[in-house]
């Protein structure tokens, strides 16, 4: 009975706090290869990270939505980390982005380099 009560109390607390269900939790040391189950979260807010793409023969396929782009300066190596409620992107060269994990914000300084692949352009 106590277990059920604590479970319900925990569920109510997460709803009151408004924590997204897909929000990663815990600590994540800096990595260029985040856990597979967190890819959707990390790629939603900084889509040019190299770990979001599968690149071969000059084209890159997005691991989340399947979109295809030409490989260029848009796809960049980056590392991500998490401490408490701070999620951080490190794009090297002194470019960083920090956000509250529970209130994420999209950010992409390379968005102008994105070039969609079109089937007719062979």
UniProtKB/Swiss-Prot annotation:
Q: List cellular component terms (GO).
A: host cell endoplasmic reticulum lumen
Signal sequence span per UniProt?
1-18
Q: Where is this motif: Prevents secretion from ER?
A: 119-122
Its predominant location is host cell
Q: Which controlled-vocabulary keywords does the entry list?
A: Early protein, Glycoprotein, Host endoplasmic reticulum, Signal
Give the InterPro entries listed for this entry. ASFV_fam_110 (IPR004848)
Where in or outside the cell? Host endoplasmic reticulum lumen
The family annotation for this protein states: Belongs to the asfivirus MGF 110 family.
Q: What is this protein identified as? A: Protein MGF 110-6L
> Which source organism?
African swine fever virus (isolate Pig/Kenya/KEN-50/1950) (ASFV)
